[in-house]
From Swiss-Prot:
It is found in: Cytoplasm. One of its GO terms (cellular component) is cytosol. Acts as a sulfur carrier required for 2-thiolation of mcm(5)S(2)U at tRNA wobble positions of cytosolic tRNA(Lys), tRNA(Glu) and tRNA(Gln). Serves as sulfur donor in tRNA 2-thiolation reaction by being thiocarboxylated (-COSH) at its C-terminus by MOCS3. The sulfur is then transferred to tRNA to form 2-thiolation of mcm(5)S(2)U. Also acts as a ubiquitin-like protein (UBL) that is covalently conjugated via an isopeptide bond to lysine residues of target proteins. It comes from Bombyx mori. Keywords: Cytoplasm, Isopeptide bond, tRNA processing, Ubl conjugation pathway. This is Ubiquitin-related modifier 1 homolog. The keyword Nucleus does not apply. Pathway: tRNA modification; 5-methoxycarbonylmethyl-2-thiouridine-tRNA biosynthesis. The modification 1-thioglycine is found at G109. The keyword ATP-binding does not apply.
Length: 109
């Protein structure tokens, strides 16, 4: 069976408030088929990472972070400091030691 996949997730711009004020966390993802046996993918993608975050780290108001199977509009996603749109968004296949940042660009007044 495959080993765990270690990635670092970071939250900023207020998104950290949805994750118990955690700004940075290194996580060891289990083999994908262990976490999601029915997944069509063989390897972790950002889509599965969002499910894992929802199930394991998200503690406040899911609707402020997720919409359907993606992040809510107004959440900027960076993969190793580059816009996720350059990497296929939800289809990006996670690699060991990737750094995934979620930044809220919406602020109340």
């Amino acid at each position: 069976m495959a080993e765990t996949l270690t990635v670092e997730v970071m939250f900023g711009g207020g998104a950290e408030l949805l994750f118990n004020k955690v700004k940075r966390k290194e996580i060891a993802l289990p083999p994908l088929k262990t976490f999601l046996p029915d997944s069509q993918n063989q390897n972790w993608t950002l889509k599965e990472l969002l499910i894992w975050l929802k199930d394991n780290l998200l503690v406040e108001r899911e609707e402020l972070f997720l919409k359907d199977d993606s992040v809510r509009p107004g959440i900027l996603v960076l993969i190793n400091e580059e816009d996720w749109e350059l990497h296929g968004q939800l289809n990006y296949e996670l690699k060991e030691n990737d750094k995934i940042m979620f930044i809220s660009t919406l602020h109340g007044g």
